[in-house]
């Protein structure tokens, strides 16, 4: 009986009826009636939701067997060193490179190791006002009011605090947003890391050299290139699978991209576990053909 399976699952994972209701997109009353065998009509649709929940959990259990711990590759060390320097010296440094090379993972790892580091993740909708509010909320400054008021509050909070402000996907920032970053740096001596795609470096110069003041303040620009070296990819593969047995097949299939490698290994691990079989070069090749990027 599916209701009993759900009860067992809830007990094992200490889940409340409210949590289940959220997952099922139903009311708490519906969950309660279902668990107690008092749901007034056919429960087939709820049984299917239980099946889906259990299947997702099984997939997560398999995922747990994939080691996604941070790996200090040579590329990662270069990025971390650039962040350390910006943090210690109060400099503006840049980390740029193609998608899928591990920029975001470096930023997150640095945050784990340094509580004084601030990470701001931006998206295409991030206007100057949104950016300032994000920074203000992250550092505990006042996020209300006009931009100049929010900026003043941020400056007051960061001045002399020896923090490191890191902006991920900084190539999405407008000229005005980048000017606010420069102003925060100038007024606080706070270290800044701008991380993003290669066009970030072009954006920092400005189409008409209007960001000359910002560009002149950049200390170092760490170019990660378009692909990771094989030695880095080998380290990532061995760490994730706890073996180097499949490195040749994986490195050939991932095309120098860490994100592609991660997707490939996750798929292979999941397939092997679900089908109760061993990972093989043939399986890796099969999965690599399904990857879009």
Identify what each model region corresponds to.
Residues 70-87:
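Pre-Walker A adenine-sensing motif
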